[in-house]
Amino acid sequence: MTDLSNLVSQCGVDLYDAEVVNENGRVIYRVYITKNGGVSLEECEAVSKLLSPIYDVMPPVSGEWILEVSSPGLERKLSKIEHFTLSIGEFAKIILNDKTEIKGKIVSVKDDNICINIKNNESIEVKFENIKKAKTYMEW
């Protein structure tokens, strides 16, 4: 992932995450990029053009696959502690390993502890290692 991070930084953006998914029988290698103020279509295109010839020679996955480059979006997966840090002030839905569901605003991140304001200014701390799945969400 470090090499990928260094490559996308050449286009003036940061690597948010990368994943391999199987949709409708197609293998898709998704690269999510970010930067302050958001990423443009042109920046996604620049990263795609940078990665395509490299991945033609050294594919990231075996077999046939498709490369997709995009922003992580407004409602995005939080799979790394850094993602929570970048999302301070945003709402998140968190599912713990014991299947408990927590919804609230990310207030702070210290070491591997994430502080969530759940309701009536009540806050709870969650250890990152106890999180099974998390994503941001918009409250309308």
UniProtKB/Swiss-Prot annotation:
Keyword terms: Cytoplasm, Ribosome biogenesis
UniProt entry tagged with the keyword Cytoplasm: yes
Subcellular location(s) per record: Cytoplasm
Keyword Lyase carried by entry: no
Disulfide bond entries: none
A GO-annotated cellular component: cytosol
A GO biological-process term: translation
CDD domains: YlxS_C
Family: Belongs to the RimP family.
NCBIfam families associated with the record: PRK14639.1
Function text: Required for maturation of 30S ribosomal subunits.
Protein name per the record: Ribosome maturation factor RimP
Species of origin: Campylobacter fetus subsp. fetus (strain 82-40)
